[in-house]
From Swiss-Prot:
It comes from the Archaea. This is Rubredoxin. Keywords: Electron transport, Iron, Metal-binding, Transport. Binds 1 Fe(3+) ion per subunit. One of its GO terms (molecular function) is iron ion binding. InterPro entries: Rubredoxin (IPR024922), Rubredoxin-like_dom (IPR024934), Rubredoxin_dom (IPR024935), Rubredoxin_ET (IPR050526), Rubredoxin_Fe_BS (IPR018527). Its cofactor is Fe(3+). It comes from Pyrococcus furiosus (strain ATCC 43587 / DSM 3638 / JCM 8422 / Vc1). Rubredoxin is a small nonheme, iron protein lacking acid-labile sulfide. Its single Fe, chelated to 4 Cys, functions as an electron acceptor and may also stabilize the conformation of the molecule. Residues 2-52 form the Rubredoxin-like domain. One of its GO terms (biological process) is alkane catabolic process. The keyword Hydrolase does not apply. Extremely thermostable, being unaffected after incubation for 24 hours at 95 degrees Celsius.
Length: 54
C-alpha cells in the first residue's frame, strides 16, 4: 500500500496504518479518505499531500 506525505508539515499518511485516532481504519486508501479529512498534525487538506514513490 502507498504512503502520502503532507507538503506542509511532513506528516506521512500510511495506507497500511490508516488514521485510527480520526476514525480512519487501517488499510484505507488515500483516495477513499473523506473529502473533509485533513492532516492530523497541521490541518492541511488532502490537496496538500503527494504520493511517496517507492
Amino acid at each position: 500500500m502507498a504512503k502520502w506525505v503532507c507538503k506542509i508539515c511532513g506528516y506521512i499518511y500510511d495506507e497500511d496504518a490508516g488514521d485510527p485516532d480520526n476514525g480512519i481504519s487501517p488499510g484505507t486508501k488515500f483516495e477513499e479518505l473523506p473529502d473533509d479529512w485533513v492532516c492530523p498534525i497541521c490541518g492541511a487538506p488532502k490537496s496538500e499531500f503527494e504520493k511517496l514513490e517507492d
